[in-house]
C-alpha cells in the first residue's frame, strides 16, 4: 500500500508539471497570442508596458502567483476596467496565456 501511495504521489506531481501548451494546438496558441496583443494590449499597452492597466512584463510579474493572475483574467477585477474572461476562455487557455505572459512571449 505504501509503495502504491508513493507511485500515485509521483504521478500526480508529474501531471502537475506537464506543460499546458501540450494540450492546446498551435492554431489556438496563435489565436491566444493575437488576443494577448490586441485585446489585452488595448489596456496594458501593445508592448505590455502599461497604460490603462498595469504592465504585463515578466519582470513586473515575478512576485505574482500564477493562480492570482489566472483568477484575475477569469473573474476580472471589480472596481477596475479589468473585465472577466470566464465564458470566453477556458481555464486551460487562461493558464496557457498566463504562462505565455510570464515568459514574455509575443513581445
Residue ranges, per PLM feature:
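Bacterial N-terminal signal peptides
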Residues: 8-16
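Alpha/beta-hydrolase active-site loop signature
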Residues: 47-50, 79
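Short cysteine/histidine-rich zinc-coordinating motifs and their immediately flanking basic loops
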Residues: 52-56
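Sec/Tat signal peptide C-region and signal peptidase I cleavage site
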Residues: 18-23
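Sequence/structural segment immediately N-terminal to covalent heme-attachment motifs in c-type
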Residues: 26-47, 68-75
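Extracytoplasmic electron-transfer domains, predominantly the class I c-type cytochrome c fold
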Residues: 58-106
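Charged, solvent-exposed alpha-helical segments that act as regulatory interaction surfaces
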Residues: 49, 106-107
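Bacterial N-terminal signal peptides that target proteins for export
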Residues: 1-8
Amino acid at each position: 500500500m505504501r509503495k502504491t501511495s508513493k507511485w500515485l504521489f509521483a504521478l500526480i506531481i508529474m501531471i502537475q508539471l506537464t506543460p499546458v501548451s501540450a494540450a492546446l494546438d498551435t492554431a489556438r496558441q496563435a489565436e491566444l497570442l493575437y488576443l494577448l496583443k490586441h485585446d489585452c494590449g488595448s489596456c496594458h499597452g501593445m508592448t505590455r508596458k502599461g497604460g490603462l492597466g498595469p504592465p504585463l512584463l515578466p519582470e513586473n510579474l515575478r512576485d505574482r502567483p500564477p493562480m492570482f493572475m489566472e483568477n484575475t483574467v477569469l473573474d476580472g477585477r471589480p472596481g477596475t476596467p479589468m473585465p472577466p474572461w470566464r465564458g470566453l476562455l477556458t481555464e486551460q487557455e487562461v493558464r496557457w496565456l498566463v504562462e505565455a505572459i510570464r515568459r514574455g512571449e509575443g513581445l
